[in-house]
Amino acid sequence: MNYELLSSLYYKGKKEYEQEYNDRFNSIASKRLNISIEENQCFYILTEEVVNKLYNVMVLNQKLDKLTSEIPGIALQQYIKKCLIDEIVLTNEIEGVVSTRKDINEILENVEDKNKRLTGLVNKYLNLCSEENIDIITCNDVRNIYNDLLWEEISEDDKLNLPDGVYFRKEGVDVLSSFKNVIHKGVMPEEKINLMMTQALNILNDRDIIPILRIAIFHYLFGYIHPFYDGNGRTSRFISSYLLSKELNTLTGFGLSYAIKENISQYYKGFKTVNEKKNKGD
């Protein structure tokens, strides 16, 4: 049985709609989250479909672990390097930022050269295949990641797009469609951005939630909050890639932007669905 959106039930009758919402929200299977979207407390239910998908992820990850263990070390390192380059090119491409594989390869060949554009982004992605741990616990941690990834690049492009608050932006920001229509307004004011990011980070670090789920939830919440003027997508994708590379096979983290780009319509539709007020935080 398909999990019907509350927004679909809304048009079938107010009584049925409210009853279904209350049943879901108060269900023993409901995980209620300490954060609200459009004034509704967020929650989710682990449906059979979601459980099956999570199981399939783990099965595929075991197969990937086995395959990579059988590849000679040098060949595997070369393949990881190729995947790293592809991920950086694609995460930029999604945002309309031009970068070439040649540029990224040159940075990888000389990581000490701090003068090249994209150096911060490349160096940060190298963490996916290293033992170094990155703290993602506080607003300051998120800001540090942004600084390492994108500060130099955005400063070079337009200093007005750099964050002007304690951690994030002070003013409003709109998310535009390809037709320049406003499809989402980032959270305001600065105090609310800081509060919601703290709540989102608490969810990300909640050990009672399955790791892949909390990574996905945080990815959505980051996009909803939209804490920066520029660089939100690339910062969010890096965080998700890094966390996936630590929870699953390293190569999984290098496939996120490809998966998003290949399913971009479905990806944006997912954001729109959760943003919809009639879905009441489901």
Regions found by a protein language model. Give the residues of each.
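FIC/Doc superfamily catalytic core
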Residues: 1-282
